């Protein structure tokens, strides 16, 4: 039997840090194999192939973040009932969450496959990469049910305070993904289809590993009758998960509108922009992990009514996140050109221009990294305290800022508006979650 981690007792700093470290490594590993995907495509197939992959990013992220938002919302109920020691309710939540994930995965896959090419055309995807972009996006969408299952399994494990199993799953999947990338892209000559297929198969392995671990947790015992739909609970789960999902959808929609303006700059510009976004994913993974650790800690202690521990946990986390952002910023500013050359072959036609685009974008983004890190903390804390409305509002703020920069400011300052749009969007989002947190803290937690 495997025990879960009870965060309602013991040292808050120790709980948050020890739980966050495996998550950081997990996210880091996930980003590394996504980087390996992009690097193999960019340097093995070509700059335009990298642009084709990059032009699909926001479209696929909309699906991925919808799934992530819903499953994160569902798992918050698991954390809360675990903190309250209501194990029967907790198991019912797990069962209903699983059924919802199947339904969500099927719906998103069906809609996504039909909408893929029309959406890419609507987003001004350059004609010289449109076919490859369609192949890559449709292959990734075909694996949506697998990704949904993996996200739910990982979220459940984290709700129990188990951050190590997702890490082990990621190590296995990352190794498999890179190996399959090499086989499918170089040996079979499948191009970007091979890279997408490798990612889907790796996610399947991750899910199976996490699922087997969940079955061994002593608190998880789902009886046959628990699979009977409880429509009241289903409604509660959906109503709680939807604001988080909508927040992510809104952010992704803003990114899609931004991508349409990026695509108009041509495939070489898209390649440089894509290379920076791959590095950006690596930079963000630490903040994402700390946010999830905070969410689990806050959800358990909020459910147990231990508000003094919430204040302690927040102070500790803010110190960690600022120090981490400054450290990452310093390292990347020095090495940014070398990082981008992992994806871009400067000896290829268009390579140097793509590299210059990426360096400029990454420089602007990294200077404001601490804002991004703080967003993840405040969003997750509000969610853990059953106050996900402001997370949704922050998503609207990101949407408005991105659209303004991509569609209005671009006429004033040129393509730099596409780079500056990220820090501007982060600032708007941070204000929408930080101010409500301090109001809620003064009114309720104190």
Cite the ranges covered by each PLM segment.
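N-terminal transmembrane alpha-helices
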Residues: 7-44, 58-73, 77, 102-109, ...
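Small-residue-rich hydrophobic transmembrane alpha-helices
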Residues: 50-110, 147-166, 272-336, 372-394
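Short alpha-helical transmembrane segments in multi-pass integral membrane proteins
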Residues: 1-20, 78-145, 187-242, 298-367, ...
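Helix-terminus/linker motif at the lipid-water interface of multi-pass membrane proteins
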Residues: 32-51, 120-127, 183-190, 249-282, ...
């Amino acid at each position: 039997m495997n025990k879960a981690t009870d965060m309602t007792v013991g040292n808050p700093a120790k709980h948050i840090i020890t739980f966050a470290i495996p998550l950081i490594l997990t996210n880091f590993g996930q980003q590394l194999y996504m980087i390996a995907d992009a690097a193999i495509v960019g340097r093995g197939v070509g700059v335009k192939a990298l642009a084709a992959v990059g032009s699909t990013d926001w479209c696929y992220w909309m699906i991925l973040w919808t799934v992530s938002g819903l499953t994160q919302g569902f798992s918050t109920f698991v954390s809360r009932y675990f903190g309250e020691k209501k194990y029967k309710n907790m198991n019912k939540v797990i069962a209903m969450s699983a059924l919802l994930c199947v339904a969500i995965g099927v719906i998103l896959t069906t809609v996504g496959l039909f909408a893929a090419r029309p959406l890419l055309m609507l987003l001004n995807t350059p004609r010289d990469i449109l076919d490859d972009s369609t192949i890559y996006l449709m292959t990734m969408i075909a694996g949506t049910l697998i990704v949904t299952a993996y996200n739910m399994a990982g979220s459940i494990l984290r709700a129990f305070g188990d951050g190590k199993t997702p890490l082990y799953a990621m190590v296995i999947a990352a190794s498999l993904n890179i190996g399959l990338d090499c086989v499918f892209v170089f040996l079979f000559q499948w191009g970007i289809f091979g890279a997408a297929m490798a990612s889907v198969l790796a996610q399947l392995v991750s899910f199976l590993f996490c699922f087997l671990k969940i079955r061994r947790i002593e608190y998880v015992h789902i009886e046959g009758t628990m699979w009977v739909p409880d429509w009241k609970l289903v409604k509660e789960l959906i109503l709680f998960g939807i604001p988080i999902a909508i927040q992510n959808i809104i952010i992704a929609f803003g990114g899609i509108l931004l991508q349409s303006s990026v695509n108009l700059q041509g495939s070489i510009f898209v390649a440089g922009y894509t290379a920076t976004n791959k590095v950006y994913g690596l930079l963000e993974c630490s903040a994402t992990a700390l946010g999830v650790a905070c969410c689990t800690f806050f959800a358990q202690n909020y459910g147990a009514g231990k508000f003094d521990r919430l204040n302690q946990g927040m102070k500790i986390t803010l110190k960690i996140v600022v120090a981490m952002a400054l450290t990452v910023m310093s390292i990347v500013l020095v090495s940014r050109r070398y990082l981008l050359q992992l994806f871009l072959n400067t000896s290829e036609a268009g390579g140097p221009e793509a590299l210059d685009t990426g360096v400029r974008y990454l420089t602007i983004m990294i200077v404001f990294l601490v804002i991004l890190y703080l967003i993840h903390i405040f969003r997750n804390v509000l969610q853990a305290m059953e106050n996900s409305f402001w997370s949704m509002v922050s998503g609207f703020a990101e949407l408005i800022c991105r659209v303004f920069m991509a569609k209005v400011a671009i006429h004033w300052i040129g393509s730099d508006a596409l780079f500056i749009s990220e820090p501007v969007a982060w600032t708007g989002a941070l204000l929408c979650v930080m101010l409500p947190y301090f109001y809620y803290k003064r009114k309720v937690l104190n």
